[in-house]
A protein has these predicted regions:
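N-terminal secretory signal peptides
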Residues: 1-32
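N-terminal export leaders
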Residues: 33-48
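Conserved functional hotspot residues or short segments at active or partner-binding sites
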Residues: 165
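Divalent-metal-activated hydrolytic enzyme cores
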Residues: 38-42, 64-105, 130-131, 140-149, ...
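Glycine-rich, flexible N-terminal cofactor/catalytic loop recognition
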Residues: 100-110, 115-120
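Boundary at the C-terminal end of the N-terminal hydrophobic targeting segment
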Residues: 58-63
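Short glycine-enriched loops at secondary-structure junctions
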Residues: 114-119, 139-142, 168, 180
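Catalytic core of membrane glycerolipid acyltransferases/transacylases, capturing the structured
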Residues: 119-136
């Protein structure tokens, strides 16, 4: 079940070669860990802000059980600010170690319902690494019964504390719904899910995209007793967001 959902995000991280011996590398990692701990105790883990930009600093692994829904959302938004500013840190982590740590289990602190658009690489957009984001993707970021079931699994079985429904600039699914053109195959099956947003916002594409994200977020809260129950118990936050593919920035809509 832990592989119920494949994020379909291809993260390419270049790794530089090193001639350092195994013993020297181990010592370096231990020393680096001590330095990070000292930085954390001094309050440096949140990062430095210089000239309005968040400077990339090493971050510790997230302790899911210690995060509140608000803190989980703040972590995602802080990651997006790093990404938009060109200071991403997720790819600096030891990916081999992360793969090993998540081999038998996953404990993502967040979930994102995103469009299938290739220009919206969710983990990169929020500067998160392996095992931190439970991602459901479908054209138009719509809350179908299958998507709701997947997100319920994230909440009930994995303990995610925040769900972000992420619309994005120039969404083709919303544009196609506005135009109402006949499409081959089952593409037009998306339209009924997006039509309420178009009816609400009119032909303005950007307005319809934002309305759609908010409507789908509301649907998650209303259609799922698992999700609504977690929200009522203050264990979960469900919000809508808008990703500008030009700037790289995410704006919360609620």
């Amino acid at each position: 079940m832990t592989s119920l959902l494949d994020s379909r995000v291809s993260t390419r991280c270049s790794q530089s070669s090193s001639a350092t011996s195994g013993a020297e590398m181990c010592a370096w990692k231990q020393d680096s860990s001590r330095r990070r701990f000292i930085q954390l105790t001094m309050g440096a883990a949140a990062g430095l802000v210089t000239g309005g930009l968040e400077v990339a600093t090493p971050r510790p692994a997230l302790a899911q059980s210690k995060l509140s829904p608000d803190a989980a959302l703040q972590e995602l938004m802080a990651g997006n600010r790093r990404f938009a500013a060109g200071h991403s840190t997720a790819c600096e982590k030891d990916l081999a170690t992360l793969r090993k740590a998540t081999e038998e289990k996953q404990e993502p602190f967040s979930a994102v319902l995103a469009c299938a658009d290739s220009r919206v690489p969710v983990e990169l957009v929020f500067d998160q690494s392996i095992g931190q984001v439970f991602v459901a993707r479908i054209a138009g970021n719509i809350a179908t019964s299958e998507i709701i079931a997947s997100l319920e699994y994230g909440v009930a079985a994995l303990g995610t504390q925040v769900i972000v429904v992420l619309g994005h600039r120039n969404c083709g699914a919303v544009k196609a719904t506005i135009e109402g053109k006949g499409e081959p195959g089952q593409i037009s099956a998306l339209y009924p899910h997006i039509r309420p947003a178009v009816d609400q916002a009119g032909p303005n594409l950007d307005a319809a995209i934002k309305a759609n994200a908010k409507i789908q977020a509301a649907l998650l809260r209303q259609a799922s007793t698992v999700i609504s129950g977690a929200v009522k118990e203050s264990k979960l936050k469900v919000v809508a967001g808008y990703y500008d593919i030009a700037s790289g920035s995410v704006t919360l809509l609620e």
